[in-house]
Amino acid sequence: AYIRQVEELFSAARTAFKHLEYYYFHNCLYEGVWKNNHRRWTEQTPTTEVMNTYGKDYRCIFVGDASMSPYEIEYPGGANEHYNTESGRTWLERAITKWPNYLWINPTTKEHWEYTHSTHIIKEIFEDRMVPLTLNGLKEGMRHLS
């Protein structure tokens, strides 16, 4: 639902960053990501490959509504589209350890975050570095990334 909005965000962000790469994931980060959402099943990139390609000096920005079953974050086998051998939390923690300048941008309004348990879990993992997709939210997010 947010793909076009996020594509516009990253199109605008290209002018702010020297090097910008983006990958898609569904709900939570797991062992594979993809560059083209229409080819998500046929052209996945291993998450470990992405982590080995970009150094710790890169900024890592996740964009998503963080709304999913808590099982998708907390348990192996919790993903709703495939069997994940490691929890989403494990992958998210690896990512934020790899890239200490990280951020989660949430396109849903901040008022709705309190109604979704998974949003609270992601905010906790991200040490409250979750901002709304608003001008003020993006300004706050840039402070987290610097």
Question: Which residues fall in each region the model found?
Answer:
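Acidic, low-complexity intrinsically disordered regions
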Residues: 1-146
